[in-house]
Amino acid sequence: MVIEKIWFHRHPLGYLLWPLLWPFSVLFGVISRSRRKAYQTGDKPSYRAPLPVVVVGNITAGGNGKTPVVVWLVETLQNLGYRPGVVSRGYGAKAPSYPLVVNEQTPAQHCGDEPKLIFQRTKAPVAVDPVRSQAVKALLEHGVNVIVTDDGLQHYALQRDIEIAVVDGVRRFGNQELIPLGPLREPVSRLDEVDFIITNGGVAKANEIAMRLQPTDAVNLKTGERCAVSKLTRLCAMAGIGHPSRFFNTLRELNADLVHCQGFADHQAFDAAQLNQLAQQGAHLIMTEKDAVKCAEFAQPNWWYLPVSAQFAPEAEQRIVDKIKEVMEPYGSPSA
């Protein structure tokens, strides 16, 4: 996409569009700062949940690897004996009504690809609502004792106890300009206020926690069969995520026999005819797990997805766990 080249690769068109886009970036900054201040001062009401809230988000537009962090966090909380629930706005989806609590039968087009993936991976209660406080209230009926929000760092209408920002360690912050001139939702200085900065790939800085996405074997969408990526011949790869090239590079690192790579927009909806035509360019079609939740109902026998999991150094993982325990302590024991 041209806009990504302008944001992250200093495309010449960016210099031509600068006079046009810069005033809108200034306006965006003024509005976002005044909006946040209104919540901080109480001029706008914010919701304080009766249980701890952990926000996982970012300061840039596009995918940074938040969802694997949310999955890791939920599984970690479950292993500690807590009962986490996840809230999301369900970006790119439209539910018949809100709040929507995700279950096995909920189609991804109603809840969103990321909430569906999180539910399938963790089996934790997941509630979707553009108004996140309403999603939290829906989860209170499901016996949860800690809330994890998928995205929502800028959703100041919901108060939080811990903020985790995920940064793309390769692309970082691009030209460091606010939307629409650059990718930033908030200035880079906003990261000085969060509890943890997790860097996905690249080289983590001194105040950041390095994360790597660890892939497993490919999984067949129809049968659930597992197979090493290197054993699948003539792969056609597709990715409808914020940074498709990251997925394709992961496949190359696994010695995949790639014959074609096709990137799509993040959260893009797919249909059977579109992907059947794409799959004809190879012997097998492989996609991200996030794409797979949208394609399962019309999947073909030669379609696969590649699960990935967030991994941290043990000491970094312990830092996050210790902070969670500290915040959770006033609310009682995990079984309370």
UniProtKB/Swiss-Prot annotation:
GO terms for molecular function: ATP binding; tetraacyldisaccharide 4'-kinase activity. Pathway: Glycolipid biosynthesis; lipid IV(A) biosynthesis; lipid IV(A) from (3R)-3-hydroxytetradecanoyl-[acyl-carrier-protein] and UDP-N-acetyl-alpha-D-glucosamine: step 6/6. Keywords: ATP-binding, Kinase, Lipid A biosynthesis, Lipid biosynthesis, Lipid metabolism, Nucleotide-binding, Transferase. It is an enzyme of class 2 (transferase). SUPFAM superfamilies: P-loop containing nucleoside triphosphate hydrolases. ATP binds at T60, A61, G62, G63, N64, G65, K66, T67. Pfam families: LpxK. Its EC number is 2.7.1.130. Transfers the gamma-phosphate of ATP to the 4'-position of a tetraacyldisaccharide 1-phosphate intermediate (termed DS-1-P) to form tetraacyldisaccharide 1,4'-bis-phosphate (lipid IVA). This is Tetraacyldisaccharide 4'-kinase. It comes from Vibrio cholerae serotype O1 (strain ATCC 39315 / El Tor Inaba N16961). The gene is lpxK.
